[in-house]
Design a protein with these regions (language model features):
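Conserved, single-site charged/polar hotspot
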Residues: 1-363
Length: 363
């Protein structure tokens, strides 16, 4: 129904929209009238158990697969709304977009007795990846979408070593585990992939999942922090993290977001030495970024300082394409200078060839 509304009576009382429905969890009772779903009432708490992950193709290039080939370490069941077929361990099941099974809805692959499903048509750094939980296959206009429905703690076993070397110190692995768990909890409420019945994908767009197989050291860190998440005023925080620091962190203003909405993200120096620098000052920032301080924790890593050389034509073409893309997504934020010096939002696809890049102001 066009007037569909959700009433949350568990957390006091709040009016929400269909975008607030959490995929894979039955937290609401739906209201049906005259053959239409016209509303819902949330009356239950979210008890986090599983997360639903879209598995991208080889190279993490797309969520759509031209075909899917899989097998299992134990016997497994392939089912749709209309039929079920049992396969033996080691049997190969293959699906193409024109397979009539997909006309029956989602195809679900469920292993017996804790078996793991190997996706033979996908390659990762570790080789052929295998997955706990179940695998769902759904038809889409551009191919087949693969969704792995897996317990959160099992998901973390293949996230932590994919995001941080398992050879790192145990306390570092524990921190990574807590951050990864918090990130997963937060994105259960993310509706970006709701049309595909998923919460996240397995690439750097979210958290890298199962690029590296699980390791005993990271598994221990996950077990020792089981259930631990980061919160602020009772809410799970958005735990962004990255691999290498330049010697200073930043707040969400780097993405144009309002830093006051995320008070737990604070810009700090990441160093053994005490520094008093104003990095919003261009001269101070230039001196900072063009020098190296051995006291900075990441000073020994290649990406601590880096340079880029780019062909000016290729750079201009890339910028023009991105500029138009940004204009389409947020036209009010892309302003073009007019003849009288004022700035207005208008369609712009090409500013020509870039001649120079300057910084007018640092946040």
């Amino acid at each position: 129904d066009d007037a569909f509304m959700i009433y949350d009576i568990y957390n006091g009382f709040a009016v929400k929209t269909y975008q607030d429905i959490i995929v894979g969890y039955s937290l609401q009772d739906f209201i049906v009238a005259e053959g239409k779903i016209c509303g819902a009432v949330i009356s239950k708490p979210l008890n986090v158990q599983n997360i639903r992950v879209i598995l991208k193709n080889t190279g993490f290039k797309s969520i759509f697969h031209e075909n899917v080939r899989l097998t299992c370490s134990k016997s497994f069941m392939v089912s749709t709304n209309e039929q079920q077929t049992r396969y033996n361990a080691g049997d190969v099941f293959e699906l193409t977009p024109d397979n009539e099974l997909l006309l029956q809805g989602r195809v679900t692959v469920t292993p017996d007795n804790g078996g793991e499903i190997s996706i033979l048509s996908v390659m990762r750094s570790q080789g052929v990846p295998s997955y706990e939980g179940s695998i769902e296959l759904a038809a889409a206009d551009d191919g087949i979408v693969i969704v792995n429905d897996v317990p959160v703690e099992s998901y973390l076993k293949r996230v932590v070593p994919s995001e941080m070397p398992a050879s790192f110190a145990v306390e570092a692995l524990k921190v990574q585990a807590v951050c990864a768990r918090s990130y997963a909890y937060k994105h259960l409420e993310n509706g970006a992939y709701s049309e595909y019945g998923a919460h996240v994908d397995d690439s750097t767009m979210y958290q890298v999942y199962n690029n590296t197989s699980e390791q005993s050291s990271s598994n221990e860190a996950i077990q020792n922090t089981r259930g631990q998440i980061l919160t602020y005023n009772g809410e799970v925080v958005q735990t962004y993290y990255y691999s290498t620091s330049c010697g200073a962190t930043t707040d969400v203003g780097i993405w144009g977001s309002d830093s006051s909405s995320y008070p737990y993200f604070v810009s700090r120096f990441v160093s053994r030495s005490q520094k008093e620098l104003d990095l919003t000052d261009e001269a101070a920032f230039e001196a900072f970024i063009t020098s190296k301080d051995e006291n900075d924790y990441d000073a020994g890593y290649a990406l601590y300082r880096w340079e880029l050389q780019a062909d000016i034509t290729a750079l201009s073409n890339s910028f023009n394409a991105k500029l138009y893309e940004k204009y389409l997504s947020a036209p009010s934020k892309i302003l073009t200078q007019q003849a009288d010096g004022s700035f207005q939002s208008q369609k712009i696809t090409d500013i020509g060839t870039i001649t120079s890049v300057t910084v007018n102001e640092r946040a």
